[in-house]
Amino acid sequence: MAKNKKDEVEVIKEGGRLEKSLVAILDNASRLQGPAVEKYVAYMRRAHPNDTPAQLIERLENRFILAVTGSGSAVGGAAAIPGLGTVASLAAVGAETAFFIESSALLTLSVASVHGIPVHDHQQRRALVLAVALGESGMQIVQKTVGSSAKNWGPLVMSRIPGGAMTNMNKSLVKKFVQKYLAKRSALLFGKLLPAGIGAVIGGAGNRVIGKGVVRNSREAFGPAPRSWPESRIIEPDPDGILEQRRDVE
């Protein structure tokens, strides 16, 4: 009996460590600054100058799916997305989880940028990233906080939510995210520990499924893309020839 109680305590402690690690990853991901996101979107627009907003968003989504699927198939493999930093010392959850969350954050904030929604405040970025990752449950928390049931709820996060309400909303989003994310990832983690080959297939396929869920949530949050680019968003040329060097990765 005493042993069972001890095991239960260890499980609780481990859960607490995992939660702290996830929160640390979330904080790092939501610190992606507005200028960095704008630079990434501008890079993509220069690489594909004829893309409409809808086409560019689809391109952003495809790059995201490709990156997270690759990271699931080969944990620790390189799947480069401009704008992402390296997250180290995340043994409790793993660098792959950090990469997935940061990639989700970059996708979410980039899509917001294409929609003309600036996300400069750290708390707003965190709320938006969490709500999109959660999908329907995130939407419900946002709608409850702002008192609106708008179908495309992404812009609601950018509305004037009082500081205390924003803090409480983020706490609710974090709690729900930790519960939901750990439940999904635990099954994938087991699959990746299977013999080589089988684990890679499960890891890649599992990440692809979760990634497609993030894409779907993003579409529901922001709604249809703008039909055209605002005239004010002029894209500078590529004086250093960087795009020519990287076109083979598109």
Regions found by a protein language model. Name each.
Residues 1-78, 102-250:
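Terminal, membrane-proximal amphipathic helices
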Residues 89-95, 201-206:
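Hydrophobic core segments of alpha-helical transmembrane domains in multi-pass membrane proteins
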Residues 90-96, 100-106:
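Glycine-rich active-site/cofactor-binding loop and its immediate structural neighborhood
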Residues 81-92, 197-198:
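Transmembrane helix boundary and interhelical junction motifs in multipass membrane proteins
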